[in-house]
From Swiss-Prot:
Keywords associated with the record: Cell inner membrane, Cell membrane, Membrane, Transmembrane, Transmembrane helix, Transport
GO MF annotation: an example: transmembrane transporter activity
Disulfide cysteine pairs (residue numbers): none
Subcellular location: Cell inner membrane
UniProt topology in membrane: Multi-pass membrane protein
The species this protein was found in: Escherichia coli O157:H7
Protein name in the entry: Uncharacterized MFS-type transporter YcaD
Annotated gene: ycaD
Cytoplasmic face of the membrane: 1-13, 66-78, 123-130, 178-203, 256-269, 312-324, 369-382
GO cellular component: plasma membrane
């Protein structure tokens, strides 16, 4: 049986369009807020509102999928995100945008959970690794193309919202031509997310997803603002964000291979150390291009390696619950990161963005160095 079946290809095609819309908004919303003369802490709170929506969406989607299936859940998630996009144009203000970004966050998280769960149920233990790799490549390619779009098109609010909303709705079209079945829904008793979070042997993976959420949430939410305060134009900000994301794309395959060959614990240690080096390089302002590249290559690949570490510790039928728990952990980190970092930037210096990233990475590195064990043979390849 082919790994990349027709439902899988159509699902990933729709995801690509949705990711383009998500990337454009994640870059431009902080800039639009800054243009409305909102303070740095307000920008951070709006970013955190989006990730709060991610948290709520992650918790709700399992129930939604069980009730209405993958296809309808995907349609519903897309409509919710489209509403969050269009709502930004109804009223410009801190409180209204706080609400609409929350709505967009719910829709975005639902899209992620639906797609990831559909891929998990479509695959087997032999091809889930390839499916997950394809998923992450599509996600990062869509994000990269979204950053390039920002550098090429008008970034005015009312110019962007119509086509971004249309792009979101277009992401529904591929799934109209196929049906994604949940063939494994009744094969095993459901596993709770809480039990996965409490699993002692998977703690390094869970902690890694939290740290990854803090790092990427801060970069996505506050990096455009950091560059804006440095006098970088909106078009150039899109370019530099594309550099950051392209490094993450290029790093996926080689880092995954290295983790398989040398063990995920060793690779995680090296990755976190490189994130610290990249943050220090950004603070030195010596060469932003290579600094952003190594920061993106190491930072954007933390989540899949940490996720693979945790998934090694569970049985085959627990993989979906574990992935939900890891996405929830990532979302919590994404929620905390921009909020606390924005407050530090507001009260002290914009450089606190990279000091914060380096600090939490150092804490995780200490956790990894304390682990003297070895990476066991995987229970399932995810």
């Amino acid at each position: 049986m082919s790994t990349y079946t027709r439902p899988v290809m159509l699902l990933l095609s729709g995801l690509l369009l949705l990711t383009l819309a998500i990337a454009v908004l994640n870059t431009l919303v902080p800039l639009w807020l800054a243009q409305e003369h909102m303070s740095t802490w307000q920008v951070g709170v709006v970013s955190s509102s989006y990730f709060t929506g991610n948290l709520v969406g992650t918790l709700l989607t399992g129930y939604v999928i069980k009730r209405i299936g993958f296809n309808r859940s995907y349609y519903l998630a897309s409509f919710i995100f489209a509403a969050g996009c269009a709502g930004l144009g109804l009223m410009i203000g801190f409180w209204s945008w706080l609400a609409w970004r929350f709505v967009a966050g719910v829709g975005c998280a639902m899209i992620w959970v639906v797609v990831e769960s559909a891929l998990m149920c479509s695959g087997t233990s032999r091809n889930r690794g390839r499916l997950l790799a394809a998923y992450m490549m599509v996600y990062y390619v869509g994000t990269f193309l979204g950053q390039l779009l920002v550098s090429k098109v008008s970034t005015e609010l009312m110019s962007v919202l119509p086509w971004v909303t249309g792009l979101t709705l277009a992401g529904i079209l591929p799934l109209l031509f196929t049906r994604v079945l949940n063939q494994q829904a009744e094969n095993h008793d459901s596993t709770s997310i809480t039990s996965m979070l409490k699993l002692r042997q998977a703690r390094l993976g869970v902690n890694g997803c939290i740290i990854s959420g803090i790092v990427l949430g801060s970069l996505y939410g506050l990096m455009p603002l950091y560059l804006n305060h440095k006098g970088v134009s909106n078009a150039s900000i899109g370019f530099w964000m594309a550099v950051l994301v392209s490094a993450g794309i290029l790093g996926q395959w080689p880092i995954g291979r290295l983790a398989d060959k040398f063990g995920r614990l060793l690779v995680l240690r090296v990755q976190v150390f490189v994130v610290i080096l990249g943050s220090i390089a950004m603070l030195s302002q010596a060469a932003m291009a290579p600094a952003l590249f190594i920061l993106g290559a190491a930072g954007f690949t933390l989540y899949p390696v940490a996720m693979a570490w945790a998934c090694e510790k569970v049985e085959h039928h627990q993989l979906v619950a574990m992935n939900q728990a890891l996405l929830l952990s990532y979302t919590v980190g994404s929620l905390l990161g921009p909020s606390f970092t924005a407050m530090l930037m507001q009260n002290f210096s914009d450089n606190l963005l990279f000091i914060m990233i380096a600090s939490v990475s150092f804490i995780y590195l200490l956790m990894l160095l304390r682990n003297a064990g070895h990476t066991p043979k995987p229970v399932a390849h995810v």
